[in-house]
Amino acid sequence: MSRIGKRIIEIPSSVQASVEGSKLLFKNNKEKHELETHNRVKITLENNQLSFQPIGEDVQSRAYWGTYGALANNIVIGLSTGFSKTLEVNGVGYKVALGNKTLDLSLGFSHPVKYPIPAGIEMVVEKNTITIKGSDKQKVGQVAAEIRSFRPPEPYKGKGVKYSDEVIIRKAGKTAKK
C-alpha cells in the first residue's frame, strides 16, 4: 500500500480546492493552480480534506495514486507557505545583480550571463546570495538548477554557483616532483 497515496491532505483555510471531473483546482488570494489527474485515480474532497484512491489494483494505478497525492500536497504547501531555494556564488570577481526582469551574473566568462526571471518566480539578491521563491516546487527547483548550471562549483577551490546546503568535496592539487 502506498504510504504517500493513503495520506490525507489537509487543505488550510487560505487555500480553496475544488474537483471538476478529473481536474483539481487550487487557488488562494493571489494565484491558482490546476492539476490534471489520470482516470485511474478517484479523488475525494470532503471537509477540506483531500484523498486519493486507486481505481484498479494494477501497478500503474498504484503508481498514479502516490504521484498525484504528492503533487497535490506540493501545490497546497506552495499556495499556503511557498517554496524557496538559496544559491551562493563563490569566486573572485563573481558578481550577481538583479536587473529589470533579469538576473545578471558575472561568472568569469568573457560576457555577462543574463537569465530572464520566469513568471511566478521571485528573486532576492543579497551580496553573493540568490534566494529563489515561488509557489510551484518544480519551477523553483528548475530555475535554481538552471542558474547553478552556468558555473557549477569546482572541486579544487570551490568557485562557482552552489546550493546553500550543498557540500563540495574538495580535491588536493598537484604535488611537486621530488
UniProtKB/Swiss-Prot annotation:
Transmembrane segments: none
GO molecular function, one term: structural constituent of ribosome
GO BP terms in the entry: cytoplasmic translation
Xref: InterPro entries: Ribosomal_uL6-like, Ribosomal_uL6-like_a/b-dom_sf, Ribosomal_uL6_a/b-dom, Ribosomal_uL6_bac-type, Ribosomal_uL6_CS
Keywords carried by this UniProt record: Ribonucleoprotein, Ribosomal protein, RNA-binding, rRNA-binding
Superkingdom, natural source: Bacteria
GO cellular component: cytosolic large ribosomal subunit
Pfam families xrefs: Ribosomal_L6
Stated role: This protein binds to the 23S rRNA, and is important in its secondary structure. It is located near the subunit interface in the base of the L7/L12 stalk, and near the tRNA binding site of the peptidyltransferase center.
Stored NCBIfam families: L6_bact
Subunit structure: Part of the 50S ribosomal subunit.
Family, similarity comment: Belongs to the universal ribosomal protein uL6 family.
Protein name in UniProt: Large ribosomal subunit protein uL6
Native source species: Helicobacter acinonychis (strain Sheeba)
